[in-house]
Amino acid sequence: MAKKDNIFKAGNFNDLPFSFNEEVTEVFEDMIDRSVPGYKSRLKLIENLGKNYYQNNSSCYDLGCSLGASTLNLLKAVGKKEGQIYAVDNSKAMISSCNSKFKNLTDSKKLDFINQDLEVIEIKDASVVVINYVLQFIESSKREKLLEKVFCGMKKNGLLILSEKTHFDNKYRNQTLFNLHHNFKSKNGYTKMEISRKRDALEGVLITDLEKDHRQRLSKIGFREIRKVMSNLNFFTLIAQK
């Protein structure tokens, strides 16, 4: 059972910017499940899409894999087919936890967890690439370059699965969805103080884009068949093909 997220309760908060350190790693499963609407449904979606788009003897990448939830669903999608899955994260704590948690799977050589910045990882022969709630933590000026590298390293007809938090250019809609997301977290047991403190910690760390900006960026790079396949409040999932 996942350890409960109490990081932002009174007495626990250190007033530092949010980071994926050991403290966050310990409670991340609980944190994301209670904070991101539709999270578990997206994981199942990754498995289903992976089954449809994985090409035999190719590679899958989970970029910004955190604790490997998406990775595990990619592994289910590939099944007994030949290929390799690379799960990459720049958090040493996250990768250390993954290597421990999935030791029986990494020993098979089919799955490889890599502690490296996404800016320097090499992408090659990829038929499925997952980027789940990751671009929002990367400097805005570097997002297009990362996606260009992904595109260049993908096989023809390869699939990108991109999930992000977003905001809206309509102020009323933006505030409405903000309030609904606040209510979602409240119903999942977070106090107003915890929600406020986490929001402050994420200030300047998590920077969202408009959905249309994501679409335009993908189209500019050369992706086609760009479609929204899931939307929950201010979180969405796009798929795009090379």
Language-model-detected regions and their locations in the chain:
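A short glycine-rich, Lys/Arg-flanked "PGG" loop and its adjoining helix->strand segment in the class I
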Residues: 144-156
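Class I SAM-dependent methyltransferase Rossmann-like catalytic core
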Residues: 13-17, 24-43
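Class I SAM-dependent methyltransferase SAM/SAH-binding core
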Residues: 61, 71-119
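Conserved alpha-helix/loop element of class I SAM-dependent methyltransferases that forms part
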Residues: 38-56
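C-terminal alpha-helical "lid/dimerization" subdomain adjacent to the S-adenosyl-L-methionine
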Residues: 166-219
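A conserved beta-strand element that flanks and buttresses the S-adenosyl-L-methionine
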Residues: 130
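Conserved class I S-adenosyl-L-methionine
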Residues: 57-66
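Conserved beta-strand signature within the Rossmann-like core of class I S-adenosyl-L-methionine
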Residues: 157-165
